[in-house]
């Protein structure tokens, strides 16, 4: 064994061994308990970043630990390879998205291997290959036949920069989630999948997910947004149709003083024929944002349509307004307004001088003061005829029942969730497998024409999708009739909604899934990824699983038992102000810093002498140029050091602050482990451990070893507090470094301890542990070694520490045998100088003894 720890030598050797032995390839084995550990697959952007490294290190630690428990562990990896960035990069680099993507995959695959992740590479998949997306296309055609897919023209969120549609979830504060451009509203024909048909199940089954973070479940609950209410029909004078509205507050119905319809509503369109002001308003609304966050904050505007609706219970005529806060896509495109008890309705009514009628009493029973704002709390009705005096629940039921009896109301459950618009106007995605025949019939692409292959040898102009620009590509023949293919492609969330299931049978040629393999491995035991996916990917992921279950492919209700959302990786961020006042962000690697005595940064400059402004720690990002290249760190310290720092610096679900001093500390620790094993093995062979012949000191050290095994096992397995597991191993290492190594049993005990330490560290730092296991002559490869088991007998304490008090004040701490009697403890306490001093010449009036813990002598 060489004396120095040289990760650059050992890591490549160990990785080659894993490749040659195919160590992490697995097949179904009914004789073993399975464990499916999955990290969210990466987008092949070109280089791994520290967020990837953290995510995949957590997954690898869990997978290696479960493997050492003797389970059949599947840990696959693949590439979420479709998506917009490839188009931009292709234009910029004068290439096509496909070669750019495949080059990136090859590069990033090497980076993953360099970090020592134990993946089953035989299952690797890339979602941009026809072998993958053909089954997604086939499944879509089956959903269409089941009535779960439809096409309609709808107002969508349109990103003018990316030239594509965004789902509501992809609009953050009125801007595109990807490029931060202001989102516009546009009418466009789109394909939808009926996720709303599964809304109740998606909501109710959240209760089955005991091991998902409450925050994620809460976000999904709110996004699905189930509400119970009443649908009410209004007659409208001089208009051929009725208006239908939905309300969750029928108790306030007697205070309804106007209705509001969307600008795109047929009633508004009809009224606009003779109303130029309304026509102009409708035009203006075409550019209104359709994201909810934007709707909530924008100025509320409207125009009176001139139509009057009739209140079903009072018979009063109330005006119908067109308003920019009502959307055709939500509900019926019409809402009832109760300005006395809804703040938005109140602001609109105040602005346009509409009637405000209070119908709910204030909490103290008085009439509400509506001079400044609406009263939105629930309460007792007044000003409501026969319903006066009823509380919220009684009024809800009484008014709902009356409207139902009159034939103008119906109790309904509504959802905030909308159907999933899966059409994208981009090129680099899976073609949607639908065709339009010459006679106008729309139908799924026949099975014998699947997959509809996306051409990869294309020229990108940065504006139009190559398959839209090429009229020949769309031409096909179906049932002997000329037809045109759909030129939209799938939202890339389609591919990431079912990849986890395809990993169970990536080579299967007969269909989307081999049910036998899928049902052996699924559900995923632990799924690891960022919380930013809570209401997009993680909702579609659950939805697709239920679709596949109902198609008979899988037999479980949910795709993953446990979800672990890792925290972000933060780093120092610095900038200097340029000549034009712009901020120029400088990498923390290039910042020369001065720190105060507490280690805080007080001054910074770069190599060019610019005074730098330090903005603190923030998420690693390109925009702030504060990303740290994992490859540079691996080349400098080794993969094991980077992995160890990632797992030690912070709990897995909390933010991690990147500190190179911490990386150096992790590296020093591994050098100490190496040194201890080197010094131990240099002394030659080791005798067998004889636990009955150990001295008290040796027993105490062995107790520490086995207590550490118990703690680390609990920390990794049950608690998943990986940082505290590492801290416990470090603490044990400090004790081992000071332990005597001269005697035969000293060395035998050290051998047992080091074999345990190396196995406990193996999930975190597998390369060094693989090597040290061989040097310690451990049995076989460490990859097949069992996890160490704590010896219960070794952990039993022979002695215990008792606190001795006189009149409640601590005077001594004594070590006594665990089976010592009260008399023996009192006798031993009396031998302590300080205790004897306070007992001299006084009478002990009372003795309080808590066995093995406390002796309090009350004297007077």
Curated annotation (Swiss-Prot):
Gene Ontology terms: biological process: leucyl-tRNA aminoacylation
Broadest EC class assigned to this enzyme: ligase
Protein name: Leucine--tRNA ligase
Matches recorded under Gene3D superfamilies: 2.20.28.290, 3.10.20.590, HUPs (3.40.50.620), Isoleucyl-tRNA Synthetase, Domain 1 (1.10.730.10)
Species the sequence originates in: Shigella boydii serotype 4 (strain Sb227)
Short motif 'HIGH' region, span: 42-52
HAMAP family assigned to the protein according to its UniProt record, in alphabetical order: Leu_tRNA_synth_B (MF_00049_B)
Catalysed transformations (reactions): tRNA(Leu) + L-leucine + ATP = L-leucyl-tRNA(Leu) + AMP + diphosphate
Transmembrane segments: none
Gene Ontology MF terms: aminoacyl-tRNA deacylase activity; ATP binding; leucine-tRNA ligase activity
Cell location: Cytoplasm
NCBIfam families, per database record: leuS_bact
Entries under CDD domains matching the protein: Anticodon_Ia_Leu_BEm (cd07958), LeuRS_core (cd00812)
Lineage: superkingdom: Bacteria
Record InterPro entries: aa-tRNA-synth_I_CS, aa-tRNA-synth_Ia, Leu-tRNA-ligase, Leu_tRNA-synth_edit, M/V/L/I-tRNA-synth_anticd-bd, Methionyl/Leucyl_tRNA_Synth, Rossmann-like_a/b/a_fold, tRNAsynth_Ia_anticodon-bd
Motif ('KMSKS' region): 619-623
GO cellular component: cytosol
Record key words, sorted: Aminoacyl-tRNA synthetase, ATP-binding, Cytoplasm, Ligase, Nucleotide-binding, Protein biosynthesis
Similarity comment: Belongs to the class-I aminoacyl-tRNA synthetase family.
Ligand binding (ATP): 622
EC nos: 6.1.1.4
């Amino acid at each position: 064994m060489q004396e120095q720890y040289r990760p650059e030598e050992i890591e490549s050797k160990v990785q080659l061994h894993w490749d040659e032995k195919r160590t992490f390839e697995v097949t179904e084995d009914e004789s073993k308990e399975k464990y499916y550990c999955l990290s969210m697959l990466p987008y092949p952007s070109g280089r791994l970043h520290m967020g990837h490294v953290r995510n995949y290190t957590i997954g690898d630690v869990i997978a290696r630990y479960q493997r050492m428990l003797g389970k059949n562990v599947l840990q696959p990896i693949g590439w979420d390879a479709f998506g917009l960035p490839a188009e931009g990069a292709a234009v910029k680099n004068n290439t096509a998205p496909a070669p750019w993507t495949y080059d990136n995959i090859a590069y990033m695959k090497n980076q993953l291997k360099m970090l020592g992740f134990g993946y089953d590479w035989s299952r690797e998949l890339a979602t941009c290959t026809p072998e993958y997306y053909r089954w997604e296309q086939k499944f879509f055609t089956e959903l269409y036949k089941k009535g779960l897919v439809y096409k309609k023209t709808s107002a969508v969120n349109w990103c003018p920069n990316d030239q594509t549609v965004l789902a509501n979830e992809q609009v953050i504060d009125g801007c595109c989630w990807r490029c931060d451009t202001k989102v516009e509203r546009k009418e466009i024909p789109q394909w939808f999948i009926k996720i709303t048909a599964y809304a109740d199940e998606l909501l109710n089954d959240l209760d089955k997910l005991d091991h998902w973070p409450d925050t994620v479940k809460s976000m999904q609950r709110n996004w699905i947004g189930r509400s119970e209410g009443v649908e009410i029909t209004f007659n409208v004078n001089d208009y051929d149709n009725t208006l239908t509205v939905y309300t969750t507050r029928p108790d306030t119905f007697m205070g309804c003083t106007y209705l509001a319809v969307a600008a795109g509503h047929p009633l508004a369109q009809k009224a606009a024929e003779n109303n130029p002001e309304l026509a102009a308003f409708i035009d203006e609304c075409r550019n209104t944002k359709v994201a909810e966050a934007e709707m909530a904050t924008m100025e509320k505007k409207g125009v009176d349509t001139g139509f009057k609706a009739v209140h079903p219970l009072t018979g009063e005529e109330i005006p119908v307004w067109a308003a920019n806060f009502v959307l055709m896509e939500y509900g019926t495109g019409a809402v009832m307004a109760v300005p006395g008890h809804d703040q938005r309705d109140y602001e609109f009514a105040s602005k346009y001088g509409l009637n405000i009628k209070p119908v709910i009493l204030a909490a103290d029973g008085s009439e509400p003061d509506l001079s400044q704002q609406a009263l939105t709390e629930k309460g007792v009705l007044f000003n409501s005829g026969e319903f006066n005096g009823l509380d919220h629940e009684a009024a809800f039921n009484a008014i709902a029942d009356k409207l139902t009896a009159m034939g103008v109301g119906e109790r309904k459950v509504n959802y905030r969730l909308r159907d999933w618009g899966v059409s994208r106007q981009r090129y680099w995605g899976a073609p949607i497998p639908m065709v339009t025949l010459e006679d106008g019939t729309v139908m799924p692409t026949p099975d014998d024409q699947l997959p509809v292959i996306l051409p990869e040898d294309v020229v990108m102009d940065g504006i139009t999708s190559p398959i839209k620009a090429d009229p020949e590509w769309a031409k096909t023949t179906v049932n002997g009739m000329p037809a045109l293919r759909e030129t939209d492609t799938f939202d890339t969330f389609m591919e990431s909604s079912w990849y986890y299931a395809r990993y169970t049978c990536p080579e299967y040629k007969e269909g989307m899934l081999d049910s036998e393999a899928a049902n052996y491995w699924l559900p995923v035991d632990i799924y690891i990824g960022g919380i930013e996916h809570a209401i997009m990917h993680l909702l579609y992921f659950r939805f697709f699983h239920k679709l596949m279950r109902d198609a008979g492919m899988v037999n479980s209700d949910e795709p993953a038992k446990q979800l672990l959302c890792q925290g972000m990786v933060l780093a120092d961020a610095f900038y200097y102000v340029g000549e034009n006042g712009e901020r120029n962000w400088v990498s923390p690697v290039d910042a020369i810093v001065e720190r105060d005595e507490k280690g805080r940064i007080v001054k910074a400059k770069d190599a060019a002498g610019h005074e730098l402004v330090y903005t603190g720690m923030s998420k690693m990002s390109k925009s702030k140029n504060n990303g740290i290249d994992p490859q540079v760190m691996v080349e400098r310290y080794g993969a094991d050091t980077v992995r160890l720092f990632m797992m030690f610096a912070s709990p897995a679900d909390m933010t991690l602050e990147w500190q190179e001093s911490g990386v150096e500390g992790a590296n020093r620790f591994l050098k100490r482990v190496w040194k201890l094993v080197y010094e131990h093995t240099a002394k030659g062979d080791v005798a067998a451990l004889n636990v009955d012949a150990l001295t008290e000191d040796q027993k105490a050290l062995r107790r520490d070893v086995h207590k550490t095994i118990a703690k680390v096992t609990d920390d990794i397995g049950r608690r998943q507090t990986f940082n505290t597991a590492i801290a416990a191993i470090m603490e044990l290492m400090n004790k081992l470094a000071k332990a005597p190594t001269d005697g035969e049993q000293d060395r035998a005990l050290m051998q047992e301890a080091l074999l345990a330490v190396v196995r406990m560290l193996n999930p975190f730092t597998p390369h060094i542990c693989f090597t040290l296991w061989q040097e310690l002559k451990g049995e076989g490869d460490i990859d097949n070694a069992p996890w160490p088991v704590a010896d219960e007998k070794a952990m039993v304490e022979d002695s215990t520490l008792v606190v001795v008090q006189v009149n409640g004040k601590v005077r001594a701490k004594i070590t006594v045998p665990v089976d010592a009697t009260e008399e023996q403890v009192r006798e031993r306490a009396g031998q302590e100088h300080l205790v004897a001093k306070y007992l001299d010449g006084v009478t002990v009036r009372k003795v309080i003894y808590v066995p093995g813990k406390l002796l309090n002598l009350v004297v007077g």
